[in-house]
Amino acid sequence: MRIRTAVPLALAATTALAGSLLLATPASAAKHQGGVHLGKIQYDSPGKDTRSNTSLKAEWVEIHNNTKAKVQLKGYKLKDNTGYTYTFPAYSIGAGKTVRVHTGKAKNSSGHVYWNRGSYVWNNTGDKARLIKPSGKLLDSCSWTKASKGTKNCH
């Protein structure tokens, strides 16, 4: 008799423990996306939208290379719903590295490239960023529907 009652009790305890572990797993524990992909997006630059170059440079999209090799981004495109398109010049992103594509104007440097626009690209109330390979194949996309601290983590 003891064996018969002990087995169901042990099974119930194991099930309860497994269920609580599943519930306790944080959402951020999801596996990091592989390949070249969109990372974090700052679609609403901090502060008031003044269209100053400082404000425009604070609107950006991160492209992350989660491979073990350097990737040449020449010809890759970053596009929004309106059709605004940034085409990468010759730019290599190292293995495990990130590059930020800023809306505003400045000289490209390590980890930062500039769209050189005089107006905002990303809609604060909803938009979709698309990363497109030179072949035209959609590599990754990330969308948002309303302002939420002005950022979206697309990993």
Please describe what each predicted stretch is.
Residues 130-145:
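Short, exposed beta-strand-loop hairpins at the edges of beta-sheets
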Residues 2-11, 17-74, 120-124, 141-155:
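A structural motif detector for short, solvent-exposed N-terminal "entry" segments of globular domains
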Residues 83-116:
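Intrinsically disordered, low-complexity Pro/Gly/Ser/Thr-rich segments with frequent PxxP/GP/PP motifs
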Residues 62, 79, 100-102:
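Hydrophobic beta-strand signal
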